[in-house]
Amino acid sequence: QLMEWVVHELKPWIDSTYRTKKSRSYTGIAGSSMGGLMALYTILHHNDTFSMAGCFSSFLYPVMEDLKKELHACSLKESRIFLSWGTDEFRSKTALAYGTDRNLYITQQLLQKGADVFPYQHIKGKHNEASWEKELPIALPFLFEE
């Protein structure tokens, strides 16, 4: 429901209130943690509206099985997706290995669907705004590359 509101109410309001380039090719969504997961779901389900997604430290663990089904069922037009995770977000090296595996699995599935994906493992990156701020100079040029 939230993403329906974003697509059908918030984006039209932004486009009517501000001078924007309204087309899909200029429209992206980004978020961190649960917001990163929502950005990923949004580009999967509203790919006719969004061509870019920045998914910073997406909260993947509890929804991975459902996400696998979503990835299998989706079709993507030309899309750019930035996926990041920090090495210091995890409590152990085993957890880091699982987190890295999940992000690379998603990367592989998105690539098979035709998306351009930038998987970024932030060395010493934490699950906080300070780390995500450092990732923006990497993510934005990729997402808005012409």
Predicted features along the sequence, with ranges:
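Non-catalytic cap/lid and distal C-terminal segments of serine-dependent acyl enzymes
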Residues: 1-146
